[in-house]
Structures are given as C-alpha cells and as structure tokens.
Regions:
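Bilobed periplasmic-binding protein-like "clamshell/Venus-flytrap" ligand-binding domains
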Residues: 115-133
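M16 family metallopeptidases and their MPP-like homologs
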Residues: 2-110, 127-135
Length: 138
C-alpha cells in the first residue's frame, strides 16, 4: 500500500491496513488520509493492491520482513498490565490455550508464504467488503 499509494502516486502521506481477527470474520481496514479530489483514485489503487495481495500473497522477502517486525516487537505487546490483560481477553474470547503467548514467536517464525496465502484466501474477500469514506466532497 505504501509503495503504490504514497510513494508512486503521492496520494497520501500515510496508508496502512490492519486486521482484527476473531472467531467470526473479523474486521479488516485500510486507512489513509488524502485530499478530496484524490479520494477516488486513492480508493481505486488501494482496492487494486488488496486484490493483488489476496490473489498473489506476499513475497518471501515481504513475509520475512513482517515476521522480523512481529517477533522483534513481541516484548512491546506484553510490556504493561493493560497489554497483558488485552492478551488474556484475546485468549479467553477466542478459546486459545492458556500458554498461547509462550509459543507465539515460534508460530510466527514457522509461517510460510503458503500459510499466509491460504489464510488470506479464507479471511479476506475484497468483493464482500464494505467501503466507508469520510470527508468532504471533491
């Protein structure tokens, strides 16, 4: 997203996506801020990037960078009582084993491109997504 929306086209200063998985479909969002006259193009490019990513999945290099980021930042996910409680809620809500956090980094390290592609195909269906745009009319 950053490469296509920000770097190549200059449509937004920042663009990011996030997925909040759960027992059901979960929520996926792409967020960006852009000028009203660029909103349609930014939305179009974002959708194209998402559809391509769901179809092709990440490259080995992209997956390794994501894994390095997640594993390297793991300590920051549990560095306060609030964050620990959030993890406990996640474990309870999703029926995960009590030792879920103990093996988290090992499970992330073991992920393959095929694993990610399969998960993307199961969880992300661009044709079923709802688009919400907030802002002024161009």
């Amino acid at each position: 997203l950053t490469e296509e929306v920000r770097e190549k086209r200059g449509l937004s200063y920042s663009v990011y996506s996030q997925f909040a998985p759960g027992l059901n479909a979960g929520a996926f969002a792409i967020s960006l801020q852009t000028r009203p006259d660029q909103a349609a193009e930014a939305l179009k490019v974002s959708r194209q990037v998402l559809e391509r990513f769901v179809a092709d999945g990440p490259t080995e290099a992209e997956l390794q960078a994501a894994k390095d980021n997640l594993i390297g930042g793991f300590a920051l996910r549990i560095d306060s009582n609030r964050k620990l409680l959030g993890n406990v809620v996640n474990i309870a809500t999703n029926g995960l084993p009590l030792d879920y956090l103990d093996g988290w980094t090992d499970r992330i390290a073991a992920l393959t491109v095929a694993d990610v592609r399969a998960a993307m195909a199961r969880k992300l269906q661009p044709q079923r997504m709802v688009t919400v745009v907030l802002g002024a009319q161009p």
